[in-house]
Structure formats: C-alpha cells, structure tokens
Amino acid sequence: MSLFEALILGIVQGLTEFLPISSTAHLRIIPALAGWNDPGAAFTAIVQMGTLAAVLIYFRSDIVCIVKAVVDGLLKGKPLNTPDATMGWMIAAGTIPIVFFGLLFKDAIETTLRSLYWISAALIGLALILWLTEVRLKQRVAKHLPLKSMEEIGWKEALLIGVAQSIALIPGSSRSGTTITGGLLLNLSREAAARFSFLLSLPSVLAAALLQLYETRHSLLASPSELTNLLVATIAAGVVGYASIAFLITYLKEHSTSVFIIYRIVIGVAILGLIATGAIQP
C-alpha cells in the first residue's frame, strides 16, 4: 500500500464511519475500483482508532461525566444513582452482544463476509429495513406519540441496540446504520439514536483495534513504511470523522435518513452491476 492509498482510505474511513452507509464497504469497494489490493480487516480495525479518537473528542464532556458518575456510583454502592451512571452501564450492556458474536464469527468476518456479494446484499438489505423504520417513525410522529430521549434508554433498549450493533459485523451493514435503526425501532428520537450509537461504538471499536494491533504487531514493527501508512490513515480518519459526527448529529435533528437509504441502494446495485460486467472481482 502506498502513502497516497493510505491517505485516501483514511479519508474514506472518516467520511463513512459515522454515516449509515458502511465504512467497511467503502474500504472494500474503492480499492476494488481503483485496482488496489484489499486493505484487509486488520487495516480497517486499526484505522478505526482515528474515528474512535473523533468520538472521544466530540463527546469528551459526556464521556467525562459518565466515567465520573460510574466510579462515584460504585464507590457509594449505588451504581445506577444518576442518569450519567446509568448511561455508562447501558453502554456496557450494549457492548456484550458484539463481543460475543465478534469472537464467535471472527474468521468469517475477516474472510468470507468481505465478499462484495455479501457487502452489496447488506447495503441493500439494511436500506430496506431503515426505510421501513422511517415509515414507522413518521406514522408515530403523525399520531403525536412521544419519542424517547437518551435518558430513557434502559436495559432492554441497550441490549437490543447492542444486538443490532452485532449485525454490523457483516461488512456493508454499517455500525451506525444498524444501531440507529435499532434505536428508531425502539422509539428513540433520531438524535438520541445517533448519540447513543456513537457512544456505544467506543468499547467495541477500541477492543477490535487493540486486538488487531496485537495480532499484527510483528509485521508492523518489521515494516516502518506500513506503520507510517497506518498512522497517516488513522490521523486522516480522525480529522474527517470529527466533521462527520458534527454533520450527522445536526442533520438528523431536522431530516430523516432517506438520503442514506437511497445512496445504499444505488451503491449496492452498482456493485452487483460492476461484478456482473467483470469490472471488479467479488
């Protein structure tokens, strides 16, 4: 991988990680179109450290309050004594499913499921589910039924959104796409679903990145150029990722996810067309 390729893929990671269009799919599609090698699951996981940093910086005040509240609650023997402490435990609970399924299907995630057939199916499939979810949400709003805020997320919501996050292990699904969809199905507002989605990503993204760093440490240390490429891609992903978070949070306050639904379907169909014509290999 050249430095230019690493920079482009880092920018792509930052642009697509937080939008419900799947960063993994784009990191697989763009190299295929450009004639580059597949960067691999390890590259994807490690570069997510950049977008992880973006979440930490953007939500730094929320995260500090949550950590302080959790520690304070444990010291007082009242772990759920404040909304911030409760949110900390909801994030922990929502992380359990992806840890279980991630370890169980690790080999398939890194090999079979990276096929462009799987990716296109996931892009189109989740788009249809998200569309049905938006229809349901609009009907609920039309009936003036209330939507839940972040503070109303309980054990049920946390675990079910965590299960939705596990679906994102299939490349093309989109972590933010599955978790926001899960949140909307559980009657969260779009903004609340997005904010919880981003906070929920912290433990699993950090764990996946650290695991891949550990497993690839020898090859990284043996190749300074590869290490440099990863560093450049990670920094680019972080800078662009921060802007993507700010955009999506603001966008969802006033708009639906329709534009992302259309985009997913167009890209999914385009991939199948390119494979059929032999322009790219699955």
UniProtKB/Swiss-Prot annotation:
InterPro entries: UppP. It catalyses: di-trans,octa-cis-undecaprenyl diphosphate + H2O = di-trans,octa-cis-undecaprenyl phosphate + phosphate + H(+). GO terms for molecular function: undecaprenyl-diphosphatase activity. It comes from the Bacteria. GO terms for biological process: cell wall organization; peptidoglycan biosynthetic process; regulation of cell shape; response to antibiotic. The keyword Transmembrane applies. The keyword Disulfide bond does not apply. It holds the Pfam family BacA. Keywords: Antibiotic resistance, Cell inner membrane, Cell membrane, Cell shape, Cell wall biogenesis/degradation, Hydrolase, Membrane, Peptidoglycan synthesis, Transmembrane, Transmembrane helix. Its main location: membrane. It is found in: Cell inner membrane. Its EC number is 3.6.1.27. Bacitracin is thought to be involved in the inhibition of peptidoglycan synthesis by sequestering undecaprenyl diphosphate, thereby reducing the pool of lipid carrier available. Belongs to the UppP family. NCBIfam families: undec_PP_bacA (TIGR00753). PANTHER family: UNDECAPRENYL-DIPHOSPHATASE (PTHR30622:SF4). This is Undecaprenyl-diphosphatase.
